[in-house]
Structures are given as structure tokens and as C-alpha cells.
Amino acid sequence: MQPFPDQTFTRADLLIRPAQPADRAALEAIAAQIWDGNDYLPRVLDAWLNDPYDGFFVATLRDRVIGVCKITRLDEGEWWLEGLRVDPAFQGHGFGRILHHFAVNHVRQHGQGVLRFSTSSENSAVQRLARETGFSRVAVFLPLGADVLAEPPAHLAPLTPADAPRIRAWLDRSAHFAACQRSLEWDWSFYFLTDARLAERLAAGLVYGWAAPDAPHGLRGLLIINSTERDRWPDQPVLKIAYLDAAPTDLTALAHDARRLAAQLGRVYVRVKALDQPDVLSAFEAAGFRCESDHHMYLYAREVSLTAHASVRLNELPPLSR
């Protein structure tokens, strides 16, 4: 898409409004220019356009859609920012900054609780936006992957809803769980592991307990996996680990068992976002996992409050023109 010939814009030219079905073609055109055409945006448009909380917005410049952002209400008091995109032809004018400020301000005016988002360590522009709008970087993860192991799991067994109390008690004692912000990860989004989410995962058969031979009835480790419903290639399902935790001495063995479980479930590969701590990464490496990227994943968070943190005011942003 070609920019406007004069490349000069005023505040009156820009409008941020709720996205509409008629915007689909423009949004797909923007997505086609991002990540070598592998942007996930086209795959979630239907869900986002039907968001019951109306958190899907586009930025238009002289009636042309040039940017997009999504505010997702994950639960009561739990908000997630995602989908910030600007047409490459219009980058460099501050539109991404305006969209980010708009999204933060919108949540502050209409919500409460915690607002979070994730981004790549290479995205310095978004990191600057995070700092100026009162976010803190609360955790760092590294994407790892491994081939499956075609042998039975040694000590993993599915857990049931009846196990929820002992799982919660075990998690509440886990320093790793606290460092992971008490959250599950699924395709770059993080969800607080509430009792309701734990119950849903248990009912779906997505939670496994790990017990060593010397304590067959005790919980020594925990593995929570994601379903395959978001897989891009359903015929080649990947075991995406939402959360994996064990004592440092058991972590490598549990990660090995996760690879075995993947084969048992008919998955072709295993992926996990591992907490960026030396002992954690070493344990995964010993279990055959390797880095899939040189870039880290940063998790940012801030409280939703009209008085806390940075002041976010659209009328204080810089002019749009160069």
C-alpha cells in the first residue's frame, strides 16, 4: 500500500474507532506485509471482530485503515494487549505510539486489575512504549523446542479434577510459579492460572503430575499443556507446554518425559517458553531442548489505575508530521 503523496498529516486526519467487518480486506493487506506474510492476524479476525467486550480498534488516516490494536479481557481484572500493527507504508510517524497510548488509556478508563502484554526482545520501539506508559518487565522467557521421544513416559500421569487442591498447594509453594507470574503461556499470551482455569485444564485432560520412583504417590513435578485448537498445521500437531515445573534436580527428567508424552499423544514436536534462568535453561538443554530463536520474550505488566504510574494523555503526544 502506498502512503499519501505529501507525507504530512495533522491530528484531525487520524481517527481511532472500533473495527468493523468491512475493515477485513485492509487488515489482511497489512498482515500480508508483516513477518513475511506469516502474521497470525488473519486467523483471529473472526474472533476479534466478534469480541463481546468491543476491544478491537483500527486507526484510520483520511478514511484509510493504517493501524490496529486489540484489548482483550481475559477475566475479571485481567487485561491483555495484543495485535498492535501499523501499515509499513505509514510507520515512522508515531501511529504505533498513539495506538498503544490509546489502548492503555481505554483500559484505564473502563477496567480495573492488571494489564499485560508480551513482546520480542528485538522490538525496542514497543519496549520504549512500555516504559513511558508505566509498565514493568516482570519476566523473561526463551523459546525452546525438541523432537519427540518414541518411548513411554516414565513417571508422568494425567491428573483429575479431584487433584486440584494438592496442585494448588504445590504451586503456592513453588518459587518457579511465582517467577512465571503465576501464569500459563499459550502462543505468546499469558493467563493467570486461576482455580477456574486449572479446573478447565484438568477436565480437558491437559494436566499431568510427575512422581519419582521413590515417591510414586507424591507430586514432584507438574506439566500443563495447551490444546491443539490454535495449531496452524493441524496435521502436524505440536505439544505446546503451557507450564512445566519441578525441583531443579527433577527438571531435566520431567522435560524428558514431556518429550515422551508428546509422542504418546501423536504430536510431532515440543515447544516451551522457558524462564530465562541459568538453572532452568541448563535443565532443558540436558533434556534435549534447543533455542529456537536468539530473541527473548519479554512479559510486561502494570496495574490498571487512573492515578498509578505514567500519565497517558493523547493531547500530549508529539505531532504526527515529520
Sequence positions of predicted segments:
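Short amphipathic alpha-helix that is part of the acyltransferase structural core
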Residues: Q2-R43, V148-Y191, P318-R322
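A conserved beta-strand-loop-helix scaffold within acyl/acetyltransferase catalytic domains
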Residues: E28-R62, G67-L84, L223-D235
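Conserved catalytic-core motifs of GNAT/GCN5-like acyltransferases
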Residues: R73, S118-T119, S136-A150, R290-V304
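A short, internal acetyl-CoA/4′-phosphopantetheine-binding micro-motif in the GNAT/acyltransferase core
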Residues: L84-Q91, S120, L239-D250
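Conserved acetyl-CoA pyrophosphate-binding loop and the N-cap/start of the following alpha-helix
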Residues: F90, G94-F102, T249-D257
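Conserved active-site alpha-helix within GNAT-family acetyltransferase domains
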Residues: R97, Q109, S121-A139, D276-E292
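Conserved GNAT acetyl-CoA-binding A-motif
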Residues: V107-E122, L129, Q264-A274
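Amide-forming acyltransferase catalytic core, primarily the GNAT-like/NAT-type
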Residues: T133-P234
